[in-house]
Amino acid sequence: YRPEEMLVICPSESGLTRGPVEIVKQARSLGIPCVCTVQSGGSPLERYCDVVIVKPSGKELALPSTKGYSVGLLVLLLCLLEGARVKGSVGQAEYGQINQSLASLGGSCQSIAGQTVKWFLRRQYPVMKPPFYRIIGYGANYGTAVEGALKMMESHKRMTAAYELEEFLH
């Protein structure tokens, strides 16, 4: 691929993490355009990106970034959808249908959040009792297990480890 055929996308909360900043610097030195999402303006990551999208999710009150992460994914999904529309990969009817589905997400998320809280309150003791947790993933979902373990540790401060299924069975 040529640089004009590539794009580096860096979803970020603070824009301070060294890895994404270094990746964007390297990409820019190769002439590859860069886009980032950040929680608020003025970060080092923004200085090296061609496009900066400030996420409208507001400040996170809890340590695990759930709201900002979800909004960042939605923003990137909208960017990809718009790119597909402009490129002609998505027809007008499909584009409208996807936008309509995305517009209903807010209400769905509130409903699911309420159901999740009720579920947790009914199971709070058995969920919080163990001193540690193991999250097991398989194949492409191993990354999901790793991210899930991180979010669990951030949320309840108990040791949580992620394992790949076949490795765990040894």
What are these regions (language model features)?
Residues 23, 105-108, 148:
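A ubiquitous structural signal for well-ordered alpha-helices
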Residues 1-8, 30, 128-170:
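Anionic-ligand anchoring segments at beta-strand to alpha-helix junctions in alpha/beta enzyme folds, i.e.
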Residues 21-22, 39-40, 119-122, 168-170:
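A generic local structural motif
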Residues 88-92, 116-120, 159:
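Short, structured loop/turn "capping" segments at alpha-beta junctions
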Residues 98-117:
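Long, charged amphipathic helices and adjacent flexible linkers at domain junctions
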Residues 1-96, 101, 138:
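Glycine-rich phosphate-binding loops that contact phosphosugars or nucleotide phosphates
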Residues 113-129:
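A short, well-structured juxtamembrane/interface segment
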Residues 10, 53-54, 111, 162-164:
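Structural signal for conserved beta-strand scaffold positions within catalytic alpha/beta enzyme cores
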